[in-house]
Amino acid sequence: MFHVILFQPEIPPNTGNVIRLCANSGCHLHLIEPLGFEMDDKRLRRAGLDYHEYATLQRHTDLASCLESLGHPRLFAFTTKGSRPFHDASFAEGDAFLFGPESRGLPAEVLDALPAEQRLRLPMREGCRSLNLSNTVAVAVYEAWRQLGFK
C-alpha cells in the first residue's frame, strides 16, 4: 500500500483522523518529529477511536531517516505551493505522500528538494488558503487507492 508521512503535525485530532484512515485503507503512517502533542493525548485517541491498534505507525526523528527506512520510495508532497493537480499524477504501490504541519505547510527546503511534478496541489476555490490536513490526506489516499482499483 502507500506510506502517509505527516511532517511535524501539530493538532492531535487531525493525526487521530489520519490514524483511523490508515487503519481502514491499509496505509502505513509515519510521523516526523517534533510532534505538537503527546501520543497519549486524549484528543488524538478520541479522533482515532479504537483504530490505533489496527494502524501501522512509526515515529521518526527527521524526514531523511524516515525515507531511508522506507528504501527511498517515490515521494509526493501535497502543498498549496504545488502547481501540478494531484489527479494528474499516476500513483503506484509503495509511493509515499508527504504532508506539512497545519500552521505553515512544508518548509521550502523540503519542497525544493522535489521535482515540480512531485509537488501536488488539491483544487480549491480562489482566495482560500488551505484544506484541513486530515481531509487532504483522505482525498489523496482515496484517489491513489482508486487508481489501484481499491486493492
Predicted regions and their residues:
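Post-transcriptional modification and biogenesis factors for structured RNAs
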Residues: 1-151
